[in-house]
């Protein structure tokens, strides 16, 4: 039922959290900041533009999240997580076949606090070249 499915999803997020924290070198940390949802972006390793393409996917996911009122954050170390034997086994378990590289984890949830005010714009940060 639904409860079992939710537990399964929570277990997967927890597994990804532990794997990411291990790469970070702080096994007890929560690099996902308590977010209930983690989207993993992968790209075919033989795609020479995989990091650029995957980065565009991450950016679009984060923009879409903002558009529907969700908070998001790009969490690194997906490459290291999915290059590990445990990560490769996880991909096989999910039915992902082929040689993929992890690009990023996009965490989603609702903010626990209000968003900080934007930083002031930097003067002379963008230059127009004619």
What does each model-identified segment do?
Residues 96-130:
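C-terminal helix-cap and adjacent tail motif
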Residues 28-30, 92-96:
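A generic local secondary-structure boundary/capping motif
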């Amino acid at each position: 039922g639904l409860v079992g499915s939710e537990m399964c999803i929570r277990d997967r997020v927890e597994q990804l959290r532990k794997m990411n924290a291990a790469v970070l070198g702080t096994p007890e940390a929560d690099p996902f900041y308590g977010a209930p949802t983690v989207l993993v972006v992968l790209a075919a390793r033989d795609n020479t533009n995989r990091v650029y393409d995957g980065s565009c996917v991450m950016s679009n996911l984060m923009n879409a999240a903002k558009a529907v009122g969700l908070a998001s954050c790009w969490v690194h170390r997906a490459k290291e997580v999915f290059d590990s034997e445990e990560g490769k086994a996880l991909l096989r378990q999910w039915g992902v076949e082929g040689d993929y590289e992890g690009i990023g984890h996009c965490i989603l949830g609702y903010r626990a606090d209000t968003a900080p005010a934007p930083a002031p714009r930097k003067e002379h940060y963008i230059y127009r070249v004619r």
